[in-house]
Amino acid sequence: MTEQQWNFAGIEAAASAIQGNVTSIHSLLDEGKQSLTKLAAAWGGSGSEAYQGVQQKWDATATELNNALQNLARTISEAGQAMASTEGNVTGMFA
């Protein structure tokens, strides 16, 4: 029978890395939006309106992506904690 081993520190590191990526993505998206906002300020008429519509869709999709990544990071972390707790309980049964 193969022995099952968990790397709890590795699981938590993965969750933290995903959360760090969420922060980086958010910063990059904000930076890009600020640059585009400066450019869009020079536009007028229907071109500006069309841009605003696309920007709103982009913002909604970016928010959805970041929320999904945050949920993934939280779920991985919670699963790691639950597995560590279970491991501790099982170990305690044999101590």
UniProtKB/Swiss-Prot annotation:
Impact upon substituting T2H: Wild-type virulence in an esxA deletion strain; protein should not be acetylated
Stated consequence of mutating Q4L: Wild-type virulence in an esxA deletion strain
Subcellular location: Secreted; Secreted, Cell wall; Host cell surface; Host cytoplasm
One Pfam family here: WXG100
Annotated phenotype, changing Q34C: NBD-linked protein does not fluoresce at acidic pH in presence of liposomes, this residue may face inwards in membranes away from lipids
Keywords: Acetylation, Apoptosis, Cell wall, Coiled coil, Host cell membrane, Host cytoplasm, Host endoplasmic reticulum, Host membrane, Membrane, Secreted, Transmembrane, Transmembrane helix, Virulence
BP term (GO), one: protein secretion by the type VII secretion system
Record's description of how this protein is used: A good candiate for vaccine development. It has been tested in a number of experimental situations.
Induction: Constitutively expressed in culture (at protein level). Up-regulated in infected human pneumonocytes. Zinc increases secreted levels of this protein; 0.5 mM Zn(2+), the physiological concentration in macrophages, induces 6-fold more secreted protein. Part of the esxB-esxA operon.
Domain of life: Bacteria
Impact upon substituting F8I: Wild-type virulence in an esxA deletion strain
Ranges that cross the membrane: 11-43, 49-85
Major subcellular site: secreted
N-acetylthreonine: modified positions: T2
CC per GO annotation: cytoplasm; cytosol; extracellular region; host cell endoplasmic reticulum; host cell plasma membrane; host cell surface; peptidoglycan-based cell wall; plasma membrane
Function: A secreted protein that plays a number of roles in modulating the host's immune response to infection as well as being responsible for bacterial escape into the host cytoplasm. Acts as a strong host (human) T-cell antigen. Inhibits IL-12 p40 (IL12B) and TNF-alpha expression by infected host (mouse) macrophages, reduces the nitric oxide response by about 75%. In mice previously exposed to the bacterium, elicits high level of IFN-gamma production by T-cells upon subsequent challenge by M.tuberculosis, in the first phase of a protective immune response. May be critical in pro-bacteria versus pro-host interactions; ESX-1 mediates DNA mediated export (maybe via EsxA). The DNA interacts with host (human) cGAS, leading to cGAMP production and activation of the host STING-TBK-1-IRF-3 signaling pathway that leads to IFN-beta which is thought to be 'pro-bacteria'. Mycobacterial dsDNA also interacts with AIM2-NLRP3-ASC to activate an inflammasome, leading to the 'pro-host' IL-1-beta.
Domain-level remarks: May be secreted as a 4 coiled-coil complex with EsxB.
Complexes and interactors: Forms a tight 1:1 complex with EsxB (CFP-10). The complex persists even after secretion. Recombinant His-tagged protein forms dimers and higher order multimers; how the protein is prepared influences its multimerization and its subsequent properties in vitro. In vitro EsxB only interacts with non-acetylated EsxA; it also interacts with C-terminally truncated EsxA (missing the last 10 residues). The native EsxA-EsxB complex dissociates at pH 4.0, and EsxA may then be freed to lyse (host) membranes. Another study using recombinant protein did not find dissociation at acidic pH.
Family (UniProt): Belongs to the WXG100 family. ESAT-6 subfamily.
Name of protein: 6 kDa early secretory antigenic target
Source organism: Mycobacterium tuberculosis (strain ATCC 25618 / H37Rv)
